[in-house]
Design a protein with these regions (language model features):
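Secondary-structure boundary elements
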Residues: 100-102, 108-181, 189, 213, ...
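Short N-terminal helix-initiation segments at or just after the protein's N-terminus
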Residues: 14-25, 162-172, 220-224
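Intrinsically disordered, low-complexity N-terminal segments that are enriched in acidic
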Residues: 1-102
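Hydrophobic/aromatic-rich core segments of domains that either
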Residues: 153, 185-272
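Short acidic/polar alpha-helix capping motifs at helix-coil junctions
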Residues: 3-4, 24-29, 97, 152-158, ...
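Short, hydrophobic/aromatic alpha-helical segments in well-folded domains
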Residues: 8, 12, 133, 171-175, ...
Length: 285
């Protein structure tokens, strides 16, 4: 299957400004199920310099800097991806990990090696805000994978999905109480739910091709949970499913703010306005 992605971002300033160093998280992160057949990238105004860099989480991004003043920053990316289908459930879970958490009276999972690397992906403080809800889902589930499937489907069915163009993400407890949220809000809420039972999770932003998604979802957000034996497994509460070849990640991080496509600053007293658009088209099945 071939798909084309066109991503346009425009920051407009009501006065001229001097742009600071920018990080553009608009580099598709490697996955074995897709191949980039074509790519084109344009930045206006012209950069003084740019280079590919990699952050602590392993994400590649484009760092760029400017010397001329401007009243706008325009970024356009175009890609053609060849996608190879795969089974998102094609893994064998570490049974000892599953059984130790599933049989735990407190419903808590624990990784055999709780290394420093895992800490950012786990819950920072002991809270049980979602535990009553999670316990109910557990009663209806036959194991850990089935639990995650049911939880993801329940969020999809019981929380209203909204399109919000603001860059902020609602607090998980607020999203839970409001019974609604954007793809980013729902992803963070499920992240925090899974962290509450000891699972490591990270936030993912990227492109999603799915006819069932409403307009505005092409620049999408989902989460990944680390399951021993399976590794990082993608989950999308906006559609109630495990992610497949239709998901192309741009960045993943335990902190959602670190996955914003454009990160940078400017010098000046101007106010800015953001307009962004993403088009995803099927070229060939």
């Amino acid at each position: 299957m071939l798909i084309q992605v066109w991503h346009h971002t425009l920051y407009s300033y009501d006065q001229v400004v001097l742009l600071g160093i920018h990080k553009l998280y608009l580099i598709p992160q490697y996955r074995p199920y897709f191949r980039i057949e074509h790519q084109k990238f344009q930045i206006n105004p012209k950069t003084e310099g740019e280079n590919f860099r990699q952050d602590l989480a392993g994400n590649w991004y484009k760092q760029c800097w400017f010397t001329q003043k401007t009243d706008h920053l325009e970024i356009t990316g175009e890609w053609i991806f060849k996608l190879q289908s795969f089974n998102p459930f094609g893994f064998i879970l570490d049974k000892s990990f599953e059984e130790s958490g599933w049989s735990n009276p407190m419903f808590q999972f624990s990784y055999e090696e709780r290394t420093a690397f895992l800490i950012p992906f786990l819950q920072e403080k002991e809270e049980t805000y979602f535990m009553d809800f999670l316990t109910q889902v557990r009663k209806e589930s036959s194991g850990l994978v089935d639990f995650i499937v049911r939880l993801t489907r329940m969020i999809y069915q019981e929380w209203k999905h909204e399109i919000r163009h603001e860059e902020n993400i609602w607090d998980s407890t607020y999203t839970f109480e409001q019974k609604k949220g954007s793809c980013r809000d729902l992803a963070l809420m499920e992240m925090d739910m899974l962290r509450e039972i000891g699972l490591a999770t990270r936030f993912v932003s990227g492109y999603a091709f799915n006819p069932d998604l409403e307009d505005g979802h092409e620049l999408h957000a989902w989460l990944e949970v680390f399951l021993p034996g399976a590794g990082w497994v993608g989950v999308d509460p906006s559609l109630g499913l495990f992610t497949d070849q239709s998901y192309i990640p741009l960045a993943s991080h335990p902190d959602p703010k670190r996955t914003l496509p454009v990160q940078g600053s400017y010098i000046g007293s101007a106010t800015s306005q953001l307009v962004t658009r993403v088009d995803v088209k099927l070229l060939h099945k």
